Amino acid sequence: MGEVRPFTLRESTQLRPSPPPPRLNSGEYTHDYNEVKALGSLNSTARTPDQTALALFYSDNFLTLWERTLRGIANANIDNIGDSARLFALANMASADAIIGAWDAKKYYNYWRPITAIQEGNNDGNKDTVGDP
């Protein structure tokens, strides 16, 4: 997906994050790992009710959330089917470019996701991270 030609970006690498993710044995990684583990745990007592509500909101499929939002905008503000189609086309082109850019970064940095990191915390070479399989 990261090698697909974007619709509006010059190239898929244009939005690649910099600097790269922190090294697994760095203090920054250790801090972030432990924060995500504490806040992201299913029964976390470190997370506020507002943080839980926000996490549940964003746990929905991104594209489903995006389309639902576009539908709400179109229904509330657009009477013409052509203008509505244009809104959906442009917004989904932007969405596709974001996904292309994200996959480019995933492939380039080859870095694991938080869920995998936390499950494999005992195997990451960092003595200050404890896995939670």
Please give the residue ranges for each predicted region.
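Acidic/polar surface patches and capping/hinge elements
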Residues: 1-133
